[in-house]
Amino acid sequence: GQTPREALRESGELWSTFSSVAAKNPHAWLKRDFDADAIMKPTADNRLIAWPYNKLMVANNMVNQGAALIITSLARAHEAGVPESRMVCFVGGAAAEEPRDYLVRDQFVESHAQNAVLGTVIDLVGGDGTAFDAIELYSCFPCVPKMARRTLGFRADVQPTVTGGLTFFGAP
């Protein structure tokens, strides 16, 4: 377990990593590299939203971006002229859900659904949760990527995002 102070520090450091990536992303909504202390400290511009999260630790509700993913066969992609460098090959997938009523859940320190999905993903990559070229641990709040890093067995120095995350990169 962690003390609240330790958990806040880990969240600030993780979100600082996300902001560093977003600062270099030309498509990011908030291109600024924040250090962990700036993310953790409540200020007029970084007010407390819901304990323990300040504004710089939650989804940015002022962003209105969209994206699309088209899934097709390799032959069809070639016919459409999609360059190989823009293709992503899916080797599998997984889905699960938690009870929508969080009061029904048996605990709050981990997610059974997340563990099931990430366990399936780890199996798909041969049992090594660190075997990814790139990963995006996207979430409204730091707690979900923190749990995912633990489930995947990531060290703190593993890059958890390629976009900059929901706070800094943005989303619909």
Positions of PLM-derived features:
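Conserved "HGTGT" condensation-loop signature of ketosynthase/thiolase-family condensing enzymes
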Residues: 1-76, 83-171
